Amino acid sequence: MATIGKNIKRLRAKQGLSQDDLARKAELKYSTLAKIEGDFVKKPGVQMVAKIAKVFGVAMEDLLK
């Protein structure tokens, strides 16, 4: 089972975004996004997940699968 960090990284690569690009679009700190992708943050907040999902145009649940 993939982690939220791996799912974000996969979608980000698929859309050709850098971590910095995604962080800016989702209005998150680059360091926060890097920690989520690196699985240092196992359970990011709902608001963070919602912002990232919105950038990707997917449901929050898709990031959690």
Feature map (PLM): residue ranges:
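A short, Lys/Arg-rich alpha-helix, primarily the initiator
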Residues: 1-14
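Short hydrophobic/aromatic patches at helix-to-coil boundaries
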Residues: 3, 61-65
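Key DNA-contacting residues within the recognition helix of helix-turn-helix
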Residues: 9, 34-35, 64
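Alpha-helical residues within the helix-turn-helix
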Residues: 13, 24, 54
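Short alpha-helical DNA-recognition segment
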Residues: 17-35
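Alpha-helical DNA-recognition elements
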Residues: 35, 39, 51
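DNA major-groove recognition helix of helix-turn-helix/homeodomain DNA-binding modules
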Residues: 47-62
